Amino acid sequence: MNIVIIGAISGIGKSLFEKYANENNRIGIIGRRVHLLDELYQKYSSKPLPTKADISNLEEIEQAINALHKEMEYIDLAIMCSGTGNINATLDYDVERPTIDTNIVGWTFAIDMFYHIFEQQSNGHLVAITSASGLRGEPMAPAYSATKAYQIN
């Protein structure tokens, strides 16, 4: 199976990558922290196709998804695990902006790209992993909760 995971370098995304890497899958991973991409590449005997991109940078994420799609020719499964958030009790916009750019703007852009790839292929599966914070809210991290509610809905 050909799989692309955005946010595969830490947390749930990394665990999913490790599970799929131990099976007979071809995996493209997208993340912004190059040293962590390199660690996965080395640890798994060059199995992943690592691509550096920051999901909040639409040009980078478009290039990364297109490059992996071209390399793989077909994507069976896309998993969205990326996300960020900050403690910000005062709702300072400068603190919230990266959360909005990552969890709403970049996330929506990537979802849209995968949707069109799957539409073109007439097949494909999309998994979006988000947070229970989108259901109950976090008063100290308001943008994080709001962006996760957006993803859930």
Please name every model-derived segment:
Residues I111, T147:
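Active-site helix of classical SDR
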Residues A89-D101:
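Short alpha-helical oligomerization interface
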Residues C81-I87:
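Conserved NAD(P)H cofactor-binding loop of Rossmann-fold oxidoreductase domains
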Residues R136-P142:
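Active-site loop immediately N-terminal to the catalytic Tyr-X3-Lys motif
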Residues Y44-E59:
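Rossmann-fold cofactor-recognition segment
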Residues S131:
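Residue(s) in the substrate-gating loop at a strand-loop-helix junction
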Residues I9-S10:
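Conserved glycine-rich cofactor-binding loop
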